[in-house]
Amino acid sequence: SDISGRAGFGARLGAYLLDFVLYGFVLAIPVIAGALVILVPIASNCVSVPGSDEIVCPPGVPSGSSVAGGVALIVLGILGVIFIYVRAEGKTGQTWGRKIVGVKVVRVADGQPPGFWRAFGRELFGNVISGQILYLGYLWMIWDRDRQTWHDKVAGTIVVKV
């Protein structure tokens, strides 16, 4: 099949690395906030025991609510970033990194963006399966005549130049 419009390995890797950095910065906000909600009460109320590695905290520090609140911030942050990422891929075929590099994900059948649930399945499969065996599922596009990764094949998508 004609692969002239398909994105190559370098462009896809570049987009992936940009996404990793850009979405990572966004994710850092709730992760840091959540960690602070948990750690500030410890830092301000607990003391180290001289001559040992032990730290002594007053009863209730950290409180269950501060730990729960911090964990909730972190979990909601992770879910929020996943939603933003998958929504962008599903709606336009482009994440921030793909937009910068000039590539997008489209359905093989009609060349349209994949839609939310197909994008979600593609990313889930990609993150869970494609990277498990020496990243073979990602590298597969180097040898594949259609330049598809395993998760592209499962989702019925290709990555094209814009």
Question: What are the functions of these language-model segments?
Answer:
Residues L27-I78:
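Membrane-helix interface segments in multi-pass membrane proteins
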Residues R107-A109:
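Short, acidic, Ser/Thr-enriched surface-loop or helix-capping motifs
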Residues G34-C46, K91-T92, W96, I100, ...:
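Membrane-interfacial segments
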